[in-house]
Amino acid sequence: HSSQASVIIDQHGQRLVVPFHDPHVSQDSGWLPIDQLKHAGMLHCDVRWVEGARHALTAARALGTPTMVDGDVAPLHILQQLMPLADYAVFSDAGLLAYTGLQDVKEALMQVAQQHKAQSRHVGASCGAEGYWWVEDGQLQHVPAPQVQVVDTLAAGDVFHGAFALALLEGKPVRQAAQFACVAASLKCTRFGGRLGCPTRAEVEAYLQAS
């Protein structure tokens, strides 16, 4: 069986995900249609299926297709395998701290940016209501998240990654892409549901124009 999860949402809109990953599912990644990556604008992977992600990321790099990895909380050995394969290493704040063993997001970002300077063109961390931090030309940069009434944070990180990748592929500079992604993720948090709560592009652009 593929992975399943129960999601518990409290009265403040914060979510707890309780996942189940079937240990009997084959980890073989040989069936992946790797040749299709040459037509992709970007490959985005998370840390849930390390064999598949490693295979696809390695192939994408060989083909010259940009890669992005969602550096969420995972066993350290998994993060150590996947994050160096990311052109865009986009951590969650908790994932970044788990990867570095540090307690401060800004310090951790600077450390990873230095360590990955030969592998990654971008290192950043999404920090929920605190917005998005990244390192550019050796300096910390920040985009705040809009302050919203939170109903449900489920899938906010996924929305951020998708919107960020889209904006980058459309040629937006990182700051503008991060603003677009922060607004998209924040609007998602005002609605119940994961996929059902995703905002439309028109809604995100209308918010940006009004702010």
Located regions from the model:
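Structured loop/turn residues at beta-strand edges in well-structured enzyme cores
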Residues: D35-K38, P84, A118
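Conserved beta-alpha-beta core of the PfkB/ribokinase-like small-molecule kinase fold
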Residues: G41-M110, G131-Y132
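Conserved phosphate-binding/catalytic region of the ribokinase-like
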Residues: L76, V105-S211
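Conserved N-terminal subdomain of the carbohydrate kinase-like
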Residues: H1-G41, V204-S211
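Acidic, amphipathic alpha-helical patches
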Residues: P33, L79, V150
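Short alpha-helical
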Residues: H1, H24, E51-G52, A74-H77, ...
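Residue-level detector of anion-binding/catalytic polar loops
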Residues: Q14, P66, Y88, L140, ...
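Active-site donor-binding loop signature of nucleotide-sugar glycosyltransferases
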Residues: F20-D22, F91, A145, T200-R201
